[in-house]
């Protein structure tokens, strides 16, 4: 079974992917044989339909979508704002992005709002839909109902369902290909404010004057540290993917990080996708040379 990774930073890391994707295509011996890129997701700046994160990326969408099409990779717009109202549906920029995206039937939308999905289904029928993790589906029954919804091609559950292995194993075999696990979530496992955090981002993307959410989680002041993420009870390691999830019939895994630096994105790729003996080769191809100084 192939494993499909859904990578962050469609717009945010455009320059990174311009350099990385030729490497992924032409140096196949560097990467695990079973490893595929299912999609790259993100959004440009100033999109009121955006959710999950606030993007500051400013790339030409035609070039972005063309790059992904060249390598037969699905582009996904993260239009997961949870506070969309009827008045927001006519937004010119977001509609134009969807029009461009829908020129290729391989592309999709990560979505939260039912109102927005109904609108997009009618206006851009070529697009597929991914149920966003911003819904914070922590109850397995709610998650199962979401997976059963034919409107969704994929569903990203809350990361705290990642290790409910007995229930995941019992899920219908026909639904398992729809499940997309978030592997490297940095959010505190005991967080009670996850929904409110995402709502705050939705308000800001809509241009509403509001206070940003203040994270109260332990170690929040440290920022994202992959080493600490690996200690999260919900973390899905490479070994977990190969030894637990793939044998159960799961094949889709999401990597977060579009608001991080490209150095961390490379570390995620090295960890999940690159054979250990070739990790130095990938570093050298991407940035490392004999004259690079760290300090």
Model-identified regions with their sequence ranges:
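Active-site pocket-lining/capping segments in soluble small-molecule metabolic enzymes
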Residues: 1-142, 152, 156-295
């Amino acid at each position: 079974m192939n494993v499909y990774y859904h990578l962050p930073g469609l717009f945010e890391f455009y320059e990174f992917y311009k350099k990385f994707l030729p490497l992924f295509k032409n140096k196949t011996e560097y990467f695990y044989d079973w490893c595929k890129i299912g999609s790259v997701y993100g959004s440009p700046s100033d999109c009121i339909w955006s959710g999950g994160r606030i993007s500051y990326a400013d790339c030409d969408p035609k070039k972005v979508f063309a790059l992904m099409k060249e390598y037969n990779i699905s582009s996904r717009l993260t239009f997961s704002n949870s506070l969309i109202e009827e008045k927001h549906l006519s937004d010119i920029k977001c509609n134009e992005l969807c029009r461009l995206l829908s020129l290729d039937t391989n592309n999709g939308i990560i979505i939260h709002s039912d109102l927005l999905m109904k609108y997009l289904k009618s206006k851009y029928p070529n697009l597929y839909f991914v149920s966003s993790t911003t819904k914070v589906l922590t109850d397995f029954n709610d998650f199962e109902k979401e997976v059963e919804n034919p409107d969704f091609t994929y569903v990203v559950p809350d990361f705290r369902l990642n290790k409910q292995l007995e229930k995941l194993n019992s899920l219908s075999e026909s639904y398992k290909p729809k499940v997309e696990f978030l592997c490297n979530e940095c959010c505190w496992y005991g967080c009670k404010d996850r929904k409110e955090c995402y709502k705050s981002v939705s308000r800001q993307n809509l241009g509403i004057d509001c206070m940003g959410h203040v994270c109260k989680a332990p170690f929040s002041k440290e920022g994202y540290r992959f080493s600490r993420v690996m200690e999260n009870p919900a973390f899905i390691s490479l070994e977990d993917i190969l030894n637990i999830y793939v044998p159960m019939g799961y094949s889709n895994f999401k990597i977060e990080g579009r608001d991080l630096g490209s150095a961390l994105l490379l570390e995620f790729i090295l960890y999940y996708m690159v054979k250990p003996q070739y990790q130095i080769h990938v570093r050298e191809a991407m940035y490392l040379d004999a004259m690079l100084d760290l300090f």
